[in-house]
Curated annotation (Swiss-Prot):
Protein name in UniProt: Benzoate 4-monooxygenase bphA
Signal peptide: none
Gene that produces this protein: bphA
Catalyzed reactions per annotation: benzoate + reduced [NADPH--hemoprotein reductase] + O2 = 4-hydroxybenzoate + oxidized [NADPH--hemoprotein reductase] + H2O + H(+)
Species of provenance: Aspergillus niger (strain ATCC MYA-4892 / CBS 513.88 / FGSC A1513)
TM stretches of this protein: 4-24
């Protein structure tokens, strides 16, 4: 055999093996051959990995659907289905589908609620945290959300007074940075009993520890989270590559793997601080970590330190850049759409007492136009833009979706960005920002069912109630107390990791007197 490899025929043998490596998966799934695929997507996962690495997977997949139709094969086993009629079939209760091996790339420390693929394990984990996020339970969180937004307002008032341009009256800032500081401090408060301190210091930083006993170091948490999301989503296209990623010549992977470790270290540091005996003895708050400590593992025992930290990490990730990205997108779309901010001023001034700076949730939760603005931003921006992959497990009967039959081992997804901008669903103005489309008198049942910013079914976002409360209070505060001017040209640029995030939003900001025209 060695002689053959070293002979002139060795190169041909190697080439033949390489061809077979990519051809066999294609031949094995003959039932998928009639589904069109861009480039080499039908033969190799590397096509999708490359699109994800470039940070615009959602655009490439959307363009593929515009070219080929509702069914597009984006990997040898993976079919993207741009059909709102497929949402319940893919993500709904009772279909038996599992999260695909894409989620293996997101595992750090220990499998958590987000990345576990086992149905029984997910049920156990979700039971531990779901009651924490009920509408009844989140009422006790509001005071901590409120306190952080008050500090946010204090800092913006300070900048409005000390950094204003004497000619325009506006202070210049990157709004995304401040929404990041706010979101991280809120989730720090809710999950670990204390904020990170980003708002107070006006910068991105967090303590991290490799182990509970190791000395602390400090990292930029927002940057770490962004890099982790990008590399994990990329490696999710080829999970077997993860153990070797840091050895690849592209520094994107090396830096990304370091970010995965750093983000885990942030969770280790926060859990370590929260579990210190003196903190435990004096703690009277029911934060998310306290709820997690009440949970049981698969043996009925209290969660071990590793699993507890992994679940805390899940909450940190889920509750930070999702809120900041959406808040930034709301400001951007409201600023670029004439008349929206003026309507917000009117409804907010009417609903909130003049002597109140930061409204309570009760003051803003029933303002229709404010809710419409938030929903419309979630539709047109789609923070979670990619199709979340689900695998048909072994033993499952064949399933027909959108006119095509899929078999065990196949992976399917519904791309939310494409669904949320479909003119067939939303009408000819689908790519325009129109809050009024959410008026119940105008909204159709089909549109309501096609709106999936938090996904749907048993793996839907468990923290939806908290997220919606945060966004209502943040937006109710920001648009009522401040005026803005756009200080950047062109559209707001975004980059996609696991989430689609803005790259910045440069604006001018000044105080507004509530009640003024």
């Amino acid at each position: 055999m060695l002689a053959l490899l070293l002979s002139p025929y060795g190169a041909y043998l190697g080439l033949a093996l390489l061809v077979l490596y990519y051809l066999l998966p294609y031949l094995k799934r003959a039932h998928l051959r009639d589904i069109p695929a861009p480039g080499l997507a039908a033969f190799t996962n590397f096509w999708l990995l490359l699109q994800t690495r470039r940070g615009h997977r959602f655009v490439v997949v959307d363009n593929a659907h515009k070219k080929y139709g509702k069914l597009v094969r984006i990997a040898p086993r993976h079919t993207s289905i741009a059909d709102d009629g497929a949402i319940q079939a893919v993500y709904g209760h009772g279909n038996g589908f599992l999260k695909s091996d894409f989620y293996d790339a997101f595992v750090s420390i220990h499998r958590g609620l987000f990345n576990t693929r086992d149905r029984a394990e997910h049920t156990r984990k979700r039971k531990t945290v779901s009651h924490t996020f009920s509408m009844k339970s989140i009422g006790q969180f509001e005071q901590y959300i409120h306190g952080n937004i008050e500090l946010f307002v204090k800092q913006w008032n300070r900048m409005a007074d000390t950094q204003r341009n004497p000619k325009t009256g506006f202070a210049s800032l990157d709004a995304l940075n401040w929404f990041n500081y706010l979101a991280f401090d809120i989730i720090g408060d809710l999950a670990f009993g204390a904020p990170f301190g980003m708002l107070d210091k006006g910068k991105d930083f967090a303590e991290m520890r490799k182990t509970p006993d190791s000395p602390p170091s400090y990292v930029q948490a927002v940057e770490v989270l962004n890099r982790r999301g990008e590399v994990s989503a990329t490696l999710g296209c080829y999970p077997a590559l993860k153990p070797f990623a840091k050895y690849l010549p592209d520094s994107f992977f090396r830096d990304g793997i370091q970010a995965v470790e750093d983000l885990a270290g942030i969770a280790v540091a926060r859990v370590n601080e929260r579990l210190r005996p003196e903190v435990m003895a004096n703690n009277t708050r029911v934060d998310l970590l306290a709820r997690l400590m009440e949970g049981k593992d698969s043996n009925g025992e209290k969660l071990g330190r590793a699993e507890l930290t992994a679940e805390a990490l899940t909450q940190l990730i889920a509750g930070s850049d999702t809120t900041s990205n959406t808040s930034c997108a709301i400001l951007y779309w409201c600023m670029r759409t004439p008349g929206v901010i003026e309507k917000l001023h009117k409804v907010l001034d009417e609903a909130i007492p003049q002597d109140v700076d930061v409204p309570t949730h009760a003051m803003v939760k029933d303002i229709p136009y404010l809710q419409w603005v938030i929903w419309e931003t979630m539709r047109i921006h789609s923070t979670s833009a990619m199709g979340l992959p689900r695998e048909i497990p072994a033993g499952n009967p064949p399933v027909t979706i959108s006119g095509h039959t899929f078999y065990p081992g196949d992976v399917v997804s519904v791309p939310s960005y494409t669904i949320h901008r479909s003119k067939e669903i939303w009408g000819p103005d689908a790519e325009q920002f129109v809050p009024e489309r959410w008026d119940p008198a105008r909204l159709t049942p089909r549109q309501k069912a096609a709106f999936i910013p938090f996904s749907t079914g048993p793996r839907a976002c468990v923290g939806r109630n908290v997220a919606e409360m945060e966004l209502l209070v943040i937006c109710g505060t920001v648009f009522r107390l401040f005026e803005f001017e756009m200080q950047q040209e062109g559209p707001m640029e975004t980059r996609e990791g696991f989430l689609r995030k803005p790259l910045g939003l440069q604006v001018g900001m000044k105080r507004r007197q509530p009640g003024s025209a």
